[in-house]
Amino acid sequence: MGASVSRGRAARVPAPEPEPEEALDLSQLPPELLLVVLSHVPPRTLLGRCRQVCRGWRALVDGQALWLLILARDHGATGRALLHLARSCQSPARNARPCPLGRFCARRPIGRNLIRNPCGQEGLRKWMVQHGGDGWVVEENRTTVPGAPSQTCFVTSFSWCCKKQVLDLEEEGLWPELLDSGRIEICVSDWWGARHDSGCMYRLLVQLLDANQTVLDKFSAVPDPIPQWNNNACLHVTHVFSNIKMGVRFVSFEHRGQDTQFWAGHYGARVTNSSVIVRVRLS
């Protein structure tokens, strides 16, 4: 007989481990190129993380050039106007750190509603409230309010119920030189209405305040009451502060309502989708 042949499995040769890739050291980039790279990072990440990397990065994040580069990417009419304002409306101490444009880019205050919880999605959170009668409650809308983030509303009772927010414009990202530039406007809006079976009254007061919360300008609305049997009437109040006085730093937004039947429960004015929006004047 012939000799037997061994057919054992061939031993596997382990694959060589890949060479570790060398990390890209951004600190070796020229400052001009590093500035371009950082301009593609989200503003909140720049302020919260990139600023902590090293002194060089902190200097770039705290400076003006990075934020002007970010703003320059918006080629719309508002974007171009903002870039012009950012270049011209700077602090007298141009080298002050950190540059206010960082907070401005992170918070994006232009064109968004600065009122928190405008429709009662979070109950009464963010509002300073005074309860009259049986107090404020949140209910679903009886009439659709266009553009509202939620079809819910705040409902008043048989005596005046009041609620208020005071907005700190600098905290929202608007710096003093921009606020005093004469190139912005403040648009306020509120929706109010009634149940079909109960009349109601409504009041609105919006005030522009200085740093000491002294009133510099105001708008008030005192519309006629909505009568009983009204087909769930829903009305819209708007106003634009177009000639902003020097020194405005806060906006106080306050509205109130009650029913006209003096019924226990919640049959009074229904308010929702309140807004305060800062816009750039394009002309």
Swiss-Prot record:
S-S bonds: none
Region of interest (Disordered), ranges: 1-23
Tissue: Predominantly expressed in brain, heart and kidney. Expressed at lower levels in liver and lung.
Family annotation (InterPro entries): F-box-assoc_dom, F-box-like_dom_sf, F-box_dom, F-box_only, Galactose-bd-like_sf
Cross-referenced SMART domains: FBA, FBOX
Entry's Gene Ontology cellular component terms: cytoplasm; cytosol; SCF ubiquitin ligase complex
Record keywords: Ubl conjugation pathway
SUBUNIT field: Part of a SCF (SKP1-cullin-F-box) protein ligase complex. Interacts with SKP1 and CUL1.
Name of the molecule in the record: F-box only protein 27
Organism: Homo sapiens (Human)
